[in-house]
Curated annotation (Swiss-Prot):
The keyword Kinase does not apply. Its main location: membrane. It is found in: Membrane. It is a multi-pass membrane protein. Residues 320-333 have a biased composition (Pro residues). GO terms for cellular component: membrane. This is Transmembrane protein 82. Residues 320-343 are annotated as: Disordered. Residues 334-343 have a biased composition (Low complexity). It comes from the Eukaryota. PANTHER family: TRANSMEMBRANE PROTEIN 82 (PTHR35257:SF1). Keywords: Membrane, Transmembrane, Transmembrane helix. It comes from Homo sapiens. Belongs to the TMEM82 family.
Length: 343
């Protein structure tokens, strides 16, 4: 009788999916990674929209955020899931490690004030493809050898779908009704965002730190599985570390001198080009195909957040915590002098 575990045997196997037990499992991992990126993207859009709605001078930016189509988000989700499915765990692990090193270097060099907050938000926007790769690497490593791997991934996909739909529903609610509800003190969700939206980047930062920590551990473990001796591992990790360090130094200087979307595209080309040259010497031929897929995935994610990247370049954005107006209390009336008539 036809059953779910026999389904992958009818599907063609892809050599690039070497750490996945089947194409179905790799597809599930790609969908989970894309849904994780959807949650991050939706919450960032909520934060930016609230910041624009609280500032009357940001009305054009607010209308740009509101004008984005939901159908394009669905296409973006499907395309990202496809890239994460076919990229391969080895290249995904390299992408995660490269971004983690760049993120640590950027966070250590951040300044204080609004400029540091804008750079932190920009880092959150640029980590989307790397986050998807980190989630797929973590799932591939944690579910390796599990007796019910496909069932576990299906349950994880269900949870990720609930989180993604909830984040998208919150984004739509805020875009449609936040201004009305926050002005009339009507909705608890909108009032919570009015008072505490400034803390949303900190919450996202903690969640991303946990996700990338798990992804980095899984990436190192997955890469080390290919090496039989310590000398082979050293021949791989030594040029990789040197290449990553030089890339980080170059990209930080380039972004500070030429901020903007064009600079981010050039940074992606330099990153993927450096990994391509590195894997020509210590990698495999299929890894080179994965680098090309990663290049398309990075550019795909940049296209989806170009509006938010433009907002990060605006001076004094994000704005500080908006003042919450308190209802005016009536002034105490002056005591009236009562004249007592003599009886």
């Amino acid at each position: 009788m036809f059953s779910l575990p026999s389904l992958p045997s009818w599907l063609p196997g892809l050599p690039s999916l070497e750490w996945g037990s089947s194409l179905l499992d790799s597809l599930l991992q790609g969908l989970i990674g894309a849904l994780g990126v959807l949650v991050l993207n939706s919450l960032l859009k909520v934060y930016f929209f609230v910041g624009c709605a609280n500032d009357p001078q940001r009305r054009p930016e607010k209308e740009r955020l509101r004008a984005q189509w939901a159908s394009l988000e669905t296409v973006h989700l499907a395309g990202l899931a496809l890239f994460l499915t076919v990229v391969g765990s080895r290249v995904a692990a390299l992408v995660v490690l490269e971004f983690s090193l760049r993120a640590v270097s950027t966070l250590l060099s951040l300044g204080k004030g609004s400029q540091g907050a804008a750079e932190r938000l920009q880092l959150y926007l640029l980590c989307q493809y790397s986050l998807g790769c980190g989630l797929t690497c973590g799932l591939s490593f944690l579910q390796e050898g599990a007796p019910h791997r496909t069932l576990n991934l299906l349950l994880s996909l269900g949870l990720a779908t609930l989180l993604g739909l909830g984040a998208r529903r919150l984004h739509r609610h805020v875009c449609r009704l936040y201004e009305l509800h926050s002005s009339q003190r009507y909705c608890g969700v909108c009032l919570g965002l009015l008072a505490h939206a400034h803390g949303l980047p900190q919450l996202l930062g903690r969640a991303l730190a946990i996700a990338f920590a798990v992804g980095d551990l899984a990436a190192v473990a997955l890469i080390n599985q290919d090496f039989l001796t310590t000398s082979e591992a050293m021949r791989f990790w030594t040029p990789l570390t040197i290449c990553y360090t030089l890339l980080v130094i170059y990209m930080q200087e380039e972004q500070r001198q030429h901020p903007g979307l064009q600079s981010q595209v050039q940074t992606v080309l330099v990153r993927m080009g450096g990994l391509f040259v590195l894997l020509l010497t210590v990698g495999r031929w299929l890894d080179l195909l994965g680098i090309l897929v990663s290049l398309l995935g990075e550019l795909w994610c940049l296209v989806g957040v170009r509006t938010l990247l433009d907002l990060c370049q605006i001076q004094d954005f994000p704005s500080q915590r908006p003042p919450v107006s308190t209802p005016s209390q009536p002034l105490p009336s002056a005591p009236q002098s009562q004249s007592s008539a003599p009886s």
